[in-house]
Amino acid sequence: MNVSILLEHINKLTPLNHAFEDDSVGLLIGDESNQVENLTVGHELEESLLEYCKDNNVDTVVTYHPPPYKRIVDENDIETYLPDPITKSFVDSSINVISIHTAQDVCEEGNAETLAELFGMSNVSIFANSVDNFGAGRKGKINKISPTDLKKDIENKLNTKIIRTNEYFNEIKEIQNIAVLPGSGTQFIDEIIYSVDVFITCLLYTSDAADD
């Protein structure tokens, strides 16, 4: 099949037009007429993935994160974006790259819904909307739990030991209302700050976490 047919299959699972407007999704390196003989998936473009593609004759990669570009602002404040070395390496190697990024976050049975199910949330509602009723965040109720036990629960369910909290986290006596959002939740704090006890997300800028 060619890349255009692969994109049709991807759109059935993860509609790319549901991604955030400013997000880079879809075919970002390559051409829709290119043939797909060997396909792999990855979280993001990196050297180990490139070597795997070369060693296994992989011509097409579906990633979560889009290929990285570097923003350059000249003396006249004109912006240009140059491909990072790893992006250029995939271009030079003629490997098609398709990114699903926030389309995967907001879709049915996507990252946001998976997190809500993982934490056993009930009375779930959507926030951080991209288009229509699709959104990257979920908020709802869980069984009452202490901060210490919630932290352990996050570590176990997400298989991580790298958890950072703000200074108020351990002052909470009991947690029942939570919000979850894959990726960076910084810009969506105002949507949930007064309706949940804890916001679980991948990234918050320090000033936002400290102030809220």
Regions found by a protein language model. Name each.
Residues 211-212:
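Disulfide-stabilized cysteine-rich extracellular repeat microdomains
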Residues 1-208:
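Hydrophobic structural segments
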